[in-house]
Curated annotation (Swiss-Prot):
EC code(s) of this entry: 1.5.1.5, 3.5.4.9
Pfam families listed in its UniProt record: THF_DHG_CYH, THF_DHG_CYH_C
Keyword Coiled coil tagged: no
Known pathway: One-carbon metabolism; tetrahydrofolate interconversion
Gene: folD
Protein name: Bifunctional protein FolD
Subunit details: Homodimer.
GO biological process: L-histidine biosynthetic process; methionine biosynthetic process; purine nucleotide biosynthetic process; tetrahydrofolate interconversion
GO CC annotation terms, alphabetical: cytosol
Amino acid sequence: MIIDVKPLYEDIKVNLLKRIEKLKRTPKLVAVTFKPDPSTVSYLKSQEKAAKRFGLDYEIFEGNSPKGVLKILAELSRDNNVNGIFVTHPLSQVNEMEIFENLVPSKDIEGRHPYNLGMLAYGEEFFAPCTAEAVVRIMENEIGIPGKNVVIVGRSNTVGKPLAIMLLRRDRSATVTVCHTKTRNLSSITKGADVVVAAAGRPGLITVDMVEKDSIIIDVGINVTDEGIIGDVSKDVANFAKVTPVPGGVGKITTILLMEHLVKSAEKMNF
């Protein structure tokens, strides 16, 4: 069975439009990149389309050198007309910590800044990483979280690690196991889970023999192949369990949450 995230998307959309109407000025999101590959360019175009759909301002800045990128970030961080900054990653030839040194946490609407991740650990975050938050929203909408046995396959700083922290919060109280591609006997761990989150970046990693019948499988993977974009979950798993689609699942919710974070930043800046 395919999990339809459209009702959740529409709920977020309705609430977001109401918040935008209350603003006195139009929020602005700026994407910063350096030597983007075709897939990055394609993603930025879809991001721009999403921003325009909500009547939000959007601009792309492309640095001409690694130092140029850092200079752009520092300038945008000081610009009171900019509410959110999105940095494409990985950013070729640019050290990630140098990026964060030049990016003010209050405009890091992706929630990737060490300050924001640290606040997340204390349950005091202003921004959570968008993809991790998208997974939580889908889980809350589909199954409810307290007491659930959740296995996360993936340990990235943007999904696996922050998602584990978010699910362990007292108001969610999931039992969380974090695995990765080096985990031995992975199927013996995923088999007993109520929810499996596939976020390892490996096409078809999760197969039908690895999951419980009617369990929830959230596919975070985005893998570009000759067949198109596919996730980390084999297609036949949907005949046995409930699976989010790729594309049109987690990514759809992630994008609208990025816009929600932008509006949240604008509200804080009294726009």
